Amino acid sequence: MPTPRVSPTLLALALAAAFPVQHAAAQATAPEAKKDVSQLEAVIVTGSRRAENLKEVPLSISAIKSEELDTYNASGQDIRALSGKVPSLNIESDFGRTFPRFYVRGLGNTDFDLNASQPVGLVYDDVVQESVALKGFPVFDMAQVELLRGPQGTLFGRNSPAGVMKFDSAKPGKRFEGYANLGYGRWNSVNLETAVNVPLSSDWSMRVAGIVQRQDNRVHNPLPNATSDLEGYNDKALRVQALYKTAGFEGLFKVQARDYKGTATTFRANIIKRGTNDLVDGYSDSYYPTDGYNSQTLKSSEVSARLRWDFDGMSLYSITAFDRAKFYSRGDVDGGFGSRFGGIKDGPDYPGQKALIPFDAQTADGIPYLRQSTQEFRLQSSTADALQWILGVYYFNEKLQVDSFNYDSFATGDPQNGYAVQHQNAKSWATFGNIKYAVTPDLKVTAGLRYTDDKKDFDAVRTWTPGKAPNVDIVGPFFAKPKSTNWSWDLGANYALDKATSLFARVATGYRAPSIQGRVLFGDSISIANSEKALSVEAGFKADLLDNTARITGTVFSYRVKDLQLTAGSGSTNQNRLVNAAKAEGQGFEIDAQAIIARDWRTTLGFSYNDTKIKDPNLFVQPCGNAGFQFLQAGTGCNVLNAPGPLPGTVSINGNPLPRAPKVVWNWTLKYSTEIGDGELTVLTDWAYKDKYNMFLYEATEYKAKAALEGGLRVGYGWAAGKYEVAAYSRNITNHRQVIAAIDFNNLTGIVNEPRSYGVQFKANF
């Protein structure tokens, strides 16, 4: 499908017409009413490692403010609540509240191994969070969240050929102040977020913030000798920051930690109706018969120091961080009970669809040891001269162990009966530079260059083959030492048509280091994906309209990724393998708009179109393994839509869209505020839409997620000049239910989206 061609001028006029009609009419008939209508605040972003007005940055950036985060987090949701809230962003997880996977413009990674890498970088308070155990840190007491689309390979330290999610927490200040935000909702969920800022002296200030999120179990398992209740969690996080500031020096010191206990994602056997992507008849959220155990724990911590020395015309930055984590997740991957191969009755059955569990699959994966250390030194100009520059060096070191376990579901206590282990030591260093030059007051050009050197030292071994005696049938050890170097660059230009409107263009390259898939618990080999390289071209506009009561940004883009790293399943084995596609291409556009449409009404609209395609006629994969069990039960398995590959049991994926990459994503909010009595009533509704997408590399009727529209509603009343507020909220207010992910090696096992939640909030500021 060709990408629609729409000019920036037409887009600006269309959005302006759609949003501020009432305001424009009021201006024409009553100019004096103009002073009664507030204006949109300027958006300041730091994606260029400088604090700049959004209109002056030649990047496609969306910013999410702290007020919006309060709304999305109301019901205790985790980082996945940001999915679809800005254009071209998708976030999902097969592990629940941990191990989120990010996709920008369709580029992401579906790998569920705990050593997986991702093409979307996550930067939390200027520190790269590389491991999957670090990426899901709770989002609380934030100043701002930014999504930087497209390759960010010159200024940010690790794999980011698709983009960067940048989280910036609120920093210590000079006033004694704070807040407490308490929410209570369905399933006895509690969401408590609090922060206090304390000035300690003329030079020192401190900010302490924390969050507690908990929920009772909402899913019951009626079978004995297994986990009885699931989907509950207890998630706690704390952040302590101390800021020291004198003339010529600033030091920001941070300690943060997370402690999570709960259950992993509930995999539900045979809930996809064969021949469709519908839920089976008789599906129930609260009913989950399984013969396995389910638990999940995560502890992580970070100590960091961000230092700045100011000199004549320049500043030196040092960012030092040490991260560590321990993670464990166990679940019943087959999603049901019994085993046809074992002669044990299997299920559950649903009306019109008999269950099939060929074999049990109860596994666990853990990270008993993770140590990440990073260091960045950055020297950059601090003048108002036409030429601005940045020079820096970066170092990354990660030491990681990944354990994989298998369990016997049919022995008393479900004892362990399999084990494999991976070790990895990853090191990377880079030098980088960036310049920004004002050719004229209206035309500014930027250029960046980065050299990166990556090395990994990896080993994996299976010391206990499932179903056999330990240390008898040892497989491995396997060793790998991939390494690569890369030059990344970008060129950009920003031209101000006037004070309200700017045009920008950017060409950029991105790079992801080689990846290793060493999940050898069910396989006898490891796989290595070569480094991937992306080239992206984009252009757009940013405009403030109608006396700064409306704002719109628009971007058109096209990218190509060579040697794209993909994760392929292994048929009827609970195993992944890494492959490189010769090429993948994507193109589309994004629109981000906000407007004050009347004195008491505000609205936002985000829209993105992403057309992605794998281009490799020689690439083929094994599709759903459950289709191979026809001898156990006729008509089982999925209906594959791709053409057969060159080998029996394979299909070609040439021309397929990238997995988990919806073509259309849009979001819309409408906010009404009015004074009542001595306070203010606020009503806010927000809606997010995702188009259909393939769950895997291949296409199958059952494994194509439906398009989804989910909405939220919040009604609040604040008084005492905003010091106090009470509110009621609901998320997924239509209770839309559908399969959003699946397990394809055993049966038609699915993962379902979160059901409707609701509750009340009370917030106090001081």
Predicted regions mapped to residue ranges:
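N-terminal Sec signal peptide and the immediately downstream disordered periplasmic leader
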Residues: 1-75, 80-85, 197, 251, ...
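Acidic, small-polar-rich N-terminal luminal/periplasmic segments of exported/outer-membrane proteins
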Residues: 39-175, 539
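Outer-membrane beta-barrel translocator/receptor signature
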Residues: 100, 117-119, 131, 140-149, ...
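Outer-membrane beta-barrel domain signature, strongest for Gram-negative TonB-dependent receptors
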Residues: 227, 231-389, 396-398, 551-553
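Structural signature of Gram-negative outer-membrane beta-barrels, strongest in the C-terminal barrel
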Residues: 243-245, 379-382, 394-396, 422-559, ...
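Membrane-embedded beta-barrel scaffold of Gram-negative outer-membrane proteins
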Residues: 304-333, 494-496, 502-512, 530-608, ...
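Gram-negative outer-membrane beta-barrel transporters
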Residues: 390, 445, 558-560, 580-697, ...
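C-terminal beta-signal and adjacent terminal beta-strands/loops
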Residues: 687-697, 717-766
